[in-house]
């Protein structure tokens, strides 16, 4: 369903709107509303997107994953991060359940912090082609050193409110 279909969903009222929305979701999104297991790896995880209902406006979308996990590729020990994703959509938005499943697919995936953070950013850019994207990976210490990894696709668009990510630098007990 393209832009016209989305416009029909938004303009419908009452029961018609509910039916239109349900039809839209079942025709375009395969994971939302379904029992879907965690993907075996980030490579096979599917990031689903849908048409931006407001492509005439620039606005920021934020997702926060405070309990992101992956595995150290050398020791197999778990690594933990607080991820903050900000993006300004163009024509497509990422569907939140598919994003949650994609992020969860890293749970048993071995990769260094930098690789995890940049892989997530690159996959999101490929799926949505946003106007602007920023990902902050605030990794908890391993071996005594916190590693924070930041990616930004460029300068944020003028006139878009981009709040601080709000994650304090790691201080431990100090």
Curated annotation (Swiss-Prot):
GO biological process: queuosine biosynthetic process; tRNA modification
Subcellular location(s) of the protein: Cytoplasm
EC id: 1.7.1.13
GO molecular function terms noted in the UniProt entry: preQ1 synthase activity
Pathway in which the depicted protein is active: tRNA modification; tRNA-queuosine biosynthesis
Catalytic activity: 7-aminomethyl-7-carbaguanine + 2 NADP(+) = 7-cyano-7-deazaguanine + 2 NADPH + 3 H(+)
An annotated GO cellular component: cytoplasm
Function of the protein: Catalyzes the NADPH-dependent reduction of 7-cyano-7-deazaguanine (preQ0) to 7-aminomethyl-7-deazaguanine (preQ1).
Family under the similarity heading: Belongs to the GTP cyclohydrolase I family. QueF type 1 subfamily.
HAMAP family, A to Z: QueF_type1
Name the record gives this protein: NADPH-dependent 7-cyano-7-deazaguanine reductase
Protein's organism: Synechococcus elongatus (strain ATCC 33912 / PCC 7942 / FACHB-805) (Anacystis nidulans R2)
Gene that specifies this protein: queF
């Amino acid at each position: 369903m393209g832009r016209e279909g989305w416009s029909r969903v938004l303009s419908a009222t009452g029961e018609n709107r509910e039916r239109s929305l349900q039809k839209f979701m079942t025709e375009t999104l395969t994971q939302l509303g379904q029992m879907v297991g965690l993907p075996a790896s980030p490579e096979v995880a599917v990031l689903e997107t849908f048409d931006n209902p407001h492509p005439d406006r620039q606005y920021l979308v934020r997702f926060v994953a405070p309990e992101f996990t992956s595995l150290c590729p050398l020791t197999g020990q778990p690594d933990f991060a607080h991820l903050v994703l900000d993006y300004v959509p163009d024509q497509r938005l990422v569907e939140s359940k598919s994003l949650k499943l994609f992020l969860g697919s890293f749970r048993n995936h071995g990769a260094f912090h930098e690789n995890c953070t940049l892989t997530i950013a690159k996959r999101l850019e490929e799926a949505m082609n946003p106007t602007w994207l920023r990902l902050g990976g605030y990794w908890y210490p391993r071996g005594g050193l916190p590693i924070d990894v930041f990616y930004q696709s460029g300068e944020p668009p003028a006139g878009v409110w981009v709040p601080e990510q709000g994650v304090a630098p790691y201080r431990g007990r100090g």
